[in-house]
Amino acid sequence: MATRSCREKAQKLNEQHQLILSKLLREEDNKYCADCEAKGPRWASWNIGVFICIRCAGIHRNLGVHISRVKSVNLDQWTAEQIQCMQDMGNTKARLLYEANLPENFRRPQTDQAVEFFIRDKYEKKKYYDKNAIAITNISSSDAPLQPLVSSPSLQAAVDKNKLEKEKEKKKEEKKREKEPEKPAKPLTAEKLQKKDQQLEPKKSTSPKKAAEPTVDLLGLDGPAVAPVTNGNTTVPPLNDDLDIFGPMISNPLPATVMPPAQGTPSAPAAATLSTVTSGDLDLFTEQTTKSEEVAKKQLSKDSILSLYGTGTIQQQSTPGVFMGPTNIPFTSQAPAAFQGFPSMGVPVPAAPGLIGNVMGQSPSMMVGMPMPNGFMGNAQTGVMPLPQNVVGPQGGMVGQMGAPQSKFGLPQAQQPQWSLSQMNQQMAGMSISSATPTAGFGQPSSTTAGWSGSSSGQTLSTQLWK
């Protein structure tokens, strides 16, 4: 109801203000625009106190509120102060004040741009303003007492009510400001905190305490050491050892000290047995590794080249399809002297009658390309190296026997076009390398060329020598 009564009062005041403005517009000077003299102005600049048209109202808005404050006569709501300003000034007094220095033959502009320039010169720059009129108006206002704006009692009562309402509002604001510092803020906050604590305490007491659950150890790495159960002299290992696949040597070593059993039996033998078991488990890999290393060293020492200079013999069977039979060949530890005395290039060297060269149809003597320093084969240009007769002896000691009277592998004889593997193996069995007597020369038939002889002493040359 209060809001409705306030609305009714405001509506009545607005109607009264409209009546006052309509009376002011009926005056002769107020019927035309104060700036462009257009008929029927419906807008007003209440701080200046003039009535203007809608076009000039837009220009006044562009000037800014510090210069001109525009209101509509019909659409906006007016206050008593604004109405008072309009009654005090009006278009007649405004022209006398702002157009005092205007030229006599001055023609008012009609275009928008020209009107804007004129309004700015008139109100913003105060180009035509009368400074003496300000002093006159100030003196007259100070000497003459203030007269009521409107003789009607209703308007005067409305103005008085507005003043009373404003005074009441000011008093209320002052009372509120006085009450604010008196109210203590800290005790309230302390009381609120205490209430919150009291509300939270019963909640905490009602909630049951959860027992601390032990963490589940999936791998059994962090579990505590379980003491072994002793029954007399026998010991039972803990259950964690059965679950641990890798044993105590990787990630879960057994503790050095064992917890004493629950009973009063002595735990010294149990600890001793556990220590021995753990040490035995730990030594499994170390013993195996050391044994394997020793065996490998022994095999390497046997298979090394230095062991080939010994006198032991190893029999080895020949594989089928290979032309070399079981041999019994020792390796000489000293270089033969026959190769040091080889002649130079281009010197014919006599060959023994039973050589491979005779088998292939070569002459008894052949050319040796280069001197051979401590080697068994000549240069690649010589073809086949001639060998002495002792290599081919009647015993059939080497491949050189192919040139013997039997001519097992000789190509000139047509009676034996094919090679017999069995005969080859039988005659290759007597091949050996002598290590006792060095040869005297290549041309001597009684001595071997590269230290070859029919003696069977020494170690057999096997396929392991070339691995």
From Swiss-Prot:
Annotated keywords? Cell membrane, GTPase activation, Membrane, Metal-binding, Zinc, Zinc-finger
ZnF (C4-type) intervals: 33-56
What residue intervals hold the motif Interaction with clathrin heavy chains?
Answer: 218-222
UniProt membrane topology term: Peripheral membrane protein
Q: Name one Pfam family in it.
A: ArfGap
- Asked if the Swiss-Prot or TrEMBL record annotates the protein with the keyword Membrane, the reply is yes
CDD domains annotated for this entry? ArfGap_SMAP
Compositionally biased spans, kind Basic and acidic residues: 160-185, 192-204
Where is the segment annotated Disordered? 145-224, 408-467
What are the GO MF terms of this UniProt record? clathrin binding; GTPase activator activity; zinc ion binding
**Entry keyword Ion transport:** no
Q: InterPro entries of this UniProt entry?
A: ARF_GTPase-activating, ARFGAP/RecO, ArfGAP_dom, ArfGAP_dom_sf, ArfGAP_SMAP1-like
Q: One biological process GO term for this chain?
A: positive regulation of erythrocyte differentiation
Q: Where is the composition biased (Polar residues)?
A: 145-155, 413-438
Q: Where is this chain's protein located in or outside the cell? A: Cell membrane
Q: Which GO terms describe its cellular component?
A: cytoplasm; plasma membrane
Q: Where mainly found?
A: membrane
The source's domain of life comes to Eukaryota
Tissue specificity, in the record's words, reads: Detected in bone marrow, adrenal gland, trachea, lymph node, spinal cord, peripheral blood leukocytes, thyroid and stomach.
Which residue numbers delimit the Arf-GAP domain?
18-136
Q: Enumerate composition-biased segments (Low complexity).
A: 446-467
Could you describe the subunit structure of this protein? Interacts with ARF6. Interacts with clathrin heavy chains via the clathrin box-like motif.
Function of the molecule? GTPase activating protein that acts on ARF6. Plays a role in clathrin-dependent endocytosis. May play a role in erythropoiesis.
Matching PANTHER family, A to Z? FI20236P1 (PTHR45705), STROMAL MEMBRANE-ASSOCIATED PROTEIN 1 (PTHR45705:SF8)
User: What is this protein called in UniProt?
Assistant: Stromal membrane-associated protein 1
UniProt lineage: Eukaryota, Metazoa, Chordata, Craniata, Vertebrata
* Gene this chain is encoded by: SMAP1
